[in-house]
């Protein structure tokens, strides 16, 4: 079974978020997603300062099996991108919850962030969505 840390929130699109500050979240792909994708060979991410809309595509991940869209779990402004993925996209496979993170999103309205997080899945609920 895939690794599903209990301290994260999850989307139906197999992305995780971790609150790093009151107004900022870190976003990445789940262990299930990376194992389903196979070897990741390229990750396309937006520039710092780009505006994201929850539920809308913000980039792509290309693997030996397919190209998949990445979807924003929250609305906000990209405050950091993982530039290590440019030269080492395989970090998404080897360390999806650590060095393989994708981007940080700053949300100016903390109340809106609280509401957005409340709509995401906890670890147990996410685990229940996975096909065995």
UniProtKB/Swiss-Prot annotation:
PANTHER family (alphabetical): GLYCINE CLEAVAGE SYSTEM H PROTEIN, GLYCINE CLEAVAGE SYSTEM H PROTEIN-RELATED
GO process terms (BP): glycine decarboxylation via glycine cleavage system
KW Cell inner membrane (keyword) present: no
Protein family (similarity comment): Belongs to the GcvH family.
Naturally occurring in which organism (per UniProt): Mycobacterium leprae (strain TN)
Keyword presence, ATP-binding: no
Positions of modified residues (N6-lipoyllysine): 65
Coiled coil: none
A UniProt-annotated Pfam family: GCV_H
Subunit structure of this chain's protein: The glycine cleavage system is composed of four proteins: P, T, L and H.
Bound cofactor: record note: Binds 1 lipoyl cofactor covalently.
Protein name: Glycine cleavage system H protein
GO cellular component: a single term: cytosol
PROSITE patterns xrefs: BIOTINYL_LIPOYL, LIPOYL
Keywords: Lipoyl
CDD domains xref list: GCS_H
Lipoyl-binding domain location: 24-106
Gene3D superfamilies: 2.40.50.100
Functional note: The glycine cleavage system catalyzes the degradation of glycine. The H protein shuttles the methylamine group of glycine from the P protein to the T protein.
Cofactors named for this entry: (R)-lipoate
């Amino acid at each position: 079974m895939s690794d599903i840390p209990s301290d994260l929130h999850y989307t139906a699109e197999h992305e995780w978020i971790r609150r790093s500050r009151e107004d900022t979240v870190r976003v990445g792909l789940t262990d299930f997603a990376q194992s389903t994708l196979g070897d990741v060979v390229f990750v396309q991410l937006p520039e710092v300062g780009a505006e994201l809309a929850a539920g809308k595509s913000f980039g792509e991940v290309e693997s030996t099996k397919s190209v998949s869209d990445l979807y924003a779990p929250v609305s906000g402004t990209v405050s950091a991108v993982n530039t290590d993925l440019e030269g080492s996209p395989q970090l998404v496979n080897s360390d999806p919850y650590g060095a393989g993170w994708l981007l940080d999103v700053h949300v100016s309205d903390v109340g809106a962030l609280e509401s957005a997080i409340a709509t995401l899945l906890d670890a147990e609920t996410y685990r229940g969505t996975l096909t065995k």
